[in-house]
């Protein structure tokens, strides 16, 4: 039941955002009482926290699985930046968490750091194999990747540029790799 509650919450969060979905809507959708929800979650905030925890765990798992498969450097970079799984968090929801759920947003920041560290590892691997120019300044490129992560989660930037997060990531990966691949 806990998983079903979380699945419905994820759908509602995607539709309405973090602050506008209600426990009544979850109960109505699942045809259960709010009391049943409270048997599994202490509060709406606990559901939000579980939603983010699930999404971020799945995100890291997706990255690890894609890196485990033999892939090109470009595929590894793309898989790290844009991981695909069932609980993708919309950019608008990440922004909402940043404003209204700062403790939850800290987990998003930890996941972002995991991805930045993973990218640094991929870049080092590329330098060692000769796929990436050895003259590339690693800390500068890592900082650039960190800023890119901020940009693709900036809702205003995406609206202004008329890009989805996925399209923005594809563009950034293309720009970076065409500039550093031998």
List the predicted regions and their residue ranges.
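Amphipathic, non-transmembrane alpha-helical scaffold segments
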Residues: 48, 52, 56, 105-116, ...
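Hydrophobic alpha-helical connector segments
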Residues: 50, 54, 61-89, 142-145
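Hydrophobic recognition helices of helix-based DNA-binding modules
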Residues: 51, 55, 59, 63, ...
